[in-house]
Amino acid sequence: FDEAEFELSPREFKDGMDQDPSAVLVDVRETYEWDICRIDGAQLMPLSSFDPTTTGLDPETTIYLYCYKGKRSMLALKELKRAGFNKLKNLSGGIDLWAEEVDSDMPQY
């Protein structure tokens, strides 16, 4: 499993989502983090209770995942991959780097 093939920089992540309106954006942080800031259009699915079989996600849809720094979202990505999902993208650097490189108005924590 090569994590690098699923990693996108914040700019690549944004461009990919912008070009694919059917893609799904998943935030795997906890609710208290979601309440501070989030990327518009995201669905909250905390890693602490993440189960690929009950997410309702379509294996044929491209799924963009993020967390605070990119580690938890990679764990969720690996679970989805094991469950048969193949169109998966992870935000390298997480929402923290996103706030620096894409959305400077976003609160950081």
Residue ranges and their predicted role:
Residues 1-24, 31-62, 68-109:
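Rhodanese-like catalytic fold shared by cysteine-dependent sulfurtransferases
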